[in-house]
């Protein structure tokens, strides 16, 4: 198998983020033949199709040579062992979304793309691990996600594309959000906490104050070591009393860059679309509009006709 080259370009897709964006951004949809909810699957496929085509015309860096869709494996991860209340405020997936997860994973296979997930780890950790491996080789990577937690990975050789805003994130965007550069995002998050993930942080300290403190002291550890020097009584006492919460929060927000992923970089190579496989899936899901777009983009299937493909499927039914 060919070695990874410095000219290679990896696209790492936050698949879990795509799922929830597809579910909440689009109206409900069901498959007419059996009533299966398919709105999230349809939206996911449409976004993936668009991303694949847009990435092939990437003029800012280069076209992708490798591509992977990365998913969360389960709600519980190693972070729950560090802090039992981590994400405890999250509700279960909606009843009409849960049955769609299986088909979303099947859709990635239909597009002939590798998907990656690992028990006990979040998608963000796997992305961070791949980024670390890619940068060590000297190749480039584009992360596709609207998740602010991935901003800590921004550096030379790494781009972040926000599909919600349809733009690439810049260093200025990160500074505007966190008040610090990307290398210090973790420290700000450790102090400010994150209510959406139930990360405690330090009570009474928000992002703005956290940024001021980190810009002044450099790191969370240096700040906590010098907390007794802070002149504001309340702030000083709060930091001293909540030192452990801040340190635990840092463990929670720091992405793992050494997750034990078994799927290697070479396995992420971008393959040609298998038209028969993709069109069969789209027809089974009754995504007629997307099927039409796919045929227009990739050409007619190898089977004699689309209707012939339908006959084959009908014969397979019990």
Language model: regions and residue ranges:
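Noncatalytic, basic helical substrate-engagement surface that gates or grips nucleic-acid strands
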Residues: 2-144, 148-170, 245-248, 254-262, ...
